[in-house]
Amino acid sequence: MADLIPLIATDSLPSNRARRPEWLKVRAPGGANYHDVFRLMREQNLHTVCEEAHCPNIGECWNHRTATFLLLGNICTRGCRYCAIGKGKPEPIDEHEPERVAASVAHLKLKFAVLTSVNRDDVPDGGASIFARTIELIRQKAPDCKVEVLIPDFDGNWEALETVLAAEPDVLNHNIETVPRLFRRFRPRARFEQSIELLARARAARPYLVTKSGMMVGAGETNEEVYQVIDRLRDVDVNVLTIGQYLSPGASYWPVDRYVTPAEFAEFRRYALERGFRHVESGPLVRSSYHAHLHVNAQQH
């Protein structure tokens, strides 16, 4: 049996803060499927957010032969204070990346694929055309595979959003990440209301589409503020919600304020379901793509 290990990320917490609780420990990744996915990603020169963002669920997901593909390289043009993905000047767009991703999806015989990306403010459409092309090629090479896209805000470029929507993903996800009071410090180059507008526009343009959002807690928000964000997301008819514990990637990042208890996560879930969400994942280790294959069935009725 694999040992229990602390999560990869390290918190920049004062020394008098409580140690990380037992519920934030995971099994060390391993197993034949895990190594098969790892090898394929290296062979195809592909990136996954599972690795780049130090996801605690990488062992579980890769052993189920699922992964979240990170499009548009692994260097982001923004500097969000919570994110472990590298920042700086990215390489030119790799026009062949969609073919390699689609081939990998087919090779792994995935029934559900998640596509996300770094922010690419250096290109006019923010990389939307790469999302669209990847969806189209997955449809060709793995027609039984459902596709979720976890998209950036495209800096408010709604034509870019339509480019992605026109490729007909099964689930459109855009994470709100945190509460309005912390938003500009947590995500200096983004706006809370712009993210809400993106989700509203997606719903208006494709009423049948499953829409999804997620946030992290334990970053300094109050529980009341979490409930208010849940309300705002329901106001724009988001179907699926994920809520997980924020873990700081290191000393230069936004610090963890506290560890939210499993009981509080359960209460967030209860409230969100009561408000009308079709599916809610709420727990310390939940990340945006956790159990994503279950979310595709959360269509409106």
Curated annotation (Swiss-Prot):
InterPro entries: Aldolase_TIM (IPR013785), Elp3/MiaA/NifB-like_rSAM (IPR006638), LIAS_N (IPR031691), Lipoyl_synth (IPR003698), rSAM (IPR007197). It catalyses: [[Fe-S] cluster scaffold protein carrying a second [4Fe-4S](2+) cluster] + N(6)-octanoyl-L-lysyl-[protein] + 2 oxidized [2Fe-2S]-[ferredoxin] + 2 S-adenosyl-L-methionine + 4 H(+) = [[Fe-S] cluster scaffold protein] + N(6)-[(R)-dihydrolipoyl]-L-lysyl-[protein] + 4 Fe(3+) + 2 hydrogen sulfide + 2 5'-deoxyadenosine + 2 L-methionine + 2 reduced [2Fe-2S]-[ferredoxin]. One of its GO terms (cellular component) is cytoplasm. Binds 2 [4Fe-4S] clusters per subunit. One cluster is coordinated with 3 cysteines and an exchangeable S-adenosyl-L-methionine. It is an enzyme of class 2 (transferase). The keyword Protein transport does not apply. Its EC number is 2.8.1.8. [4Fe-4S] cluster 2 binds at C76, C80, C83. GO terms for molecular function: 4 iron, 4 sulfur cluster binding; lipoate synthase activity; metal ion binding. PROSITE patterns: RADICAL_SAM (PS51918). Its cofactor is [4Fe-4S] cluster. [4Fe-4S] cluster 1 binds at C50, C55, C61, S289. Pathway: Protein modification; protein lipoylation via endogenous pathway; protein N(6)-(lipoyl)lysine from octanoyl-[acyl-carrier-protein]: step 2/2. The keyword Iron-sulfur applies. It is found in: Cytoplasm. Keywords: 4Fe-4S, Cytoplasm, Iron, Iron-sulfur, Metal-binding, S-adenosyl-L-methionine, Transferase. Residues 62-278 form the Radical SAM core domain. Pfam families: LIAS_N, Radical_SAM. It comes from the Bacteria. NCBIfam families: lipA (TIGR00510), PRK05481.1 (NF004019), PRK12928.1 (NF009544). Belongs to the radical SAM superfamily. Lipoyl synthase family. This is Lipoyl synthase. It comes from Roseiflexus sp. (strain RS-1).
